[in-house]
Amino acid sequence: MAQAAVERRVFRLSVDEETVVAAGVGALSEAPRAAGGTAYIVHEEALSAEAARLARILEARGVEVLGAVAGGGERVKSLDWVTRLWDLMLQAGVERSTTVYIIGGGALLDAAGFAASTLMRGLSTVNIPSTTLAAFDAAAGGKTGVNLRGKNMVGTFHNPRMVLVEPGIVAGQPDEGYRDGFAELVKHVALSGDREPAASLLPQALARRPAPLARLAFWSLGYKMQVVAGDPRERGLRRILNLGHTIGHALEAASSYTLSHGRSVSIGLAGELELSRRLAGLPRGEAEDVLDMLSTAGLPLEPPPGLAGEAAGLVGLDKKREGGSIVMPLLERLGRPRLSRVPVETVSRLMVELWGGG
């Protein structure tokens, strides 16, 4: 497949707020479009070369880069780290017009996005994902946050001005974790009912070919942003994006986060597809199509031995719980999700039935 040009789409979120999603080889060159005169760069520790490249692109267009700082991993999702970042940005001389460019995975996008959204009552951001999980999902949608007695308990909705998917940066992700993001891609396939992009491009994207990887990221982020544009603050429709996450989050927590988010969501999708078959009438063949995509991506469909029983006991702690039920998305058909109140006990029993009580 020939290298595709940079694809670009604008998503209007409100009268005065929009997010531009751009993906393709050369997407980084779009960065100056979002600059407000000065810039500050936050990047993963392993991406210093990419940060320097971004700085050269910005400076060549007359944008002053005030400074850069490295960080990454779940440790950045703390108020201590955010306080340090606030201090560094203030020392560098950021102003209300400064744009913060964030090159990294989901944890860094969350934490640095939160820092930018609160400093001076909100600085503009540009997200540049470095992982498949971020490129297919986390880089768009505007959720920021840090951990406090639980994951993402302190945060804001702060949509980036741009999301730039430079496939060479994403393709450089280490093998461990590269496949994880494909769980979120497959989730979007199930919710949208549009199987074509993944069916034709999945093997090439798994092989890290830049053009197919960028095309899938553009499609996946585009689907998510269509949903987000209709419900920016997650009061209704946007909650369909939690498909796979009720069971997935319980498994992640039960493993003390040794089971990655992407793998947890993959297993969660398998469980919630079965729940959709039983409670919403999802045809078996359509469920199997989704499971086949997860398997093609090399993702698990069941948890490690002994984990399901402990995870089943954690389902009731889900933030989506209302009384004795959880408001969660189920699929009537691929492309036809609905929000349903499912008793906590129903979800817990299903997990034990499918995977054992440990």
UniProtKB/Swiss-Prot annotation:
Known catalytic reactions: 7-phospho-2-dehydro-3-deoxy-D-arabino-heptonate = 3-dehydroquinate + phosphate
EC numbers for this chain: 4.2.3.4
The biological processes this protein is annotated with in GO are:
amino acid biosynthetic process; aromatic amino acid family biosynthetic process; chorismate biosynthetic process
Membrane as a keyword of this entry, yes or no, is: no
Q: Where does Zn(2+) bind?
A: E184, H245, H261
Q: Which Pfam families match?
A: DHQ_synthase, DHQS_C
Q: What is its main location?
A: cytoplasm
Q: Which NCBIfam families match?
A: aroB
What is the name attached to this protein's record?
Answer: 3-dehydroquinate synthase
List the top taxonomic levels of the source. Answer: Archaea, Thermoproteota, Thermoprotei, Desulfurococcales, Desulfurococcaceae
**The gene coding this protein:** aroB
